[in-house]
A protein has these predicted regions:
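N-terminal targeting leaders
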Residues: 2-185
């Protein structure tokens, strides 16, 4: 089963790389990660999701999101208790390729459909503002929004990161900004 998943992920990633199509909203050729790191991040996300689904009831696993950027794994979503939160982090840290786990899971009930729609709107607003600003490499920033909290991931220069963070802080609907950038200068 794991081999089948690996082949499927690799096939999709390879097809995307050949045409430089968009993946997760960003063209692969505009990413500061290498093609290998990009594929590795997709594999990490699949492995994390599978570990959650193999361990927790489907209702719990479906409320845990895994986002990997340059082998740093961000966990967001809602879990029913602290023990589940800790177990999810342990499972994520057990993925060999992962360098760092950012456990941003909250102990609460699942968010509403309206909250999810609001998060999508906030993400769109953030990405639009980042892409409009010519001093920020908006295509190189991964944006994740959960319950109004915006998480920023990417490989940026410090000045780019400072500007991007300020843009996001001043975007409608953003309640908090969590900066997870890695600096390249």
């Amino acid at each position: 089963m794991n081999k089948l998943i690996y082949v499927a992920v690799f096939g999709v990633a390879l097809a995307q790389l050949q045409g430089c199509t968009t993946a997760g909203g960003e063209p692969v050729n505009l990413d500061r990660r290498s093609a290998g790191a990009y594929i590795g991040d997709q594999e990490i996300e699949v492995r994390a999701k599978n570990r959650m689904r193999d361990t927790f009831p489907i209702k719990v696993a479906n409320n845990i999101s895994s986002t990997s950027y340059n082998r740093q794994l961000l966990l967001t979503g809602q879990v029913p208790d602290q023990a589940t939160r800790a177990k999810a982090e342990e499972l994520a840290k057990g993925i060999l390729e992962v360098r760092t786990v950012f456990n941003e899971l909250t102990v609460s009930g699942a968010t509403s459909l309206a909250s999810g729609a609001n998060d999508a709107t906030v993400t769109t607003g953030v990405k639009t503002r980042l892409l409009r600003d010519k001093t920020v490499p908006g295509t190189k920033i991964k944006v994740v929004t959960e319950n109004g909290v915006v998480y920023l991931m990417g490989l940026l220069k410090r000045a780019e990161a400072d500007t991007a963070t300020e843009i996001v802080r001043n975007t409608a609907g953003v309640t908090k900004v969590v900066v997870l950038f890695e600096f390249i200068d």
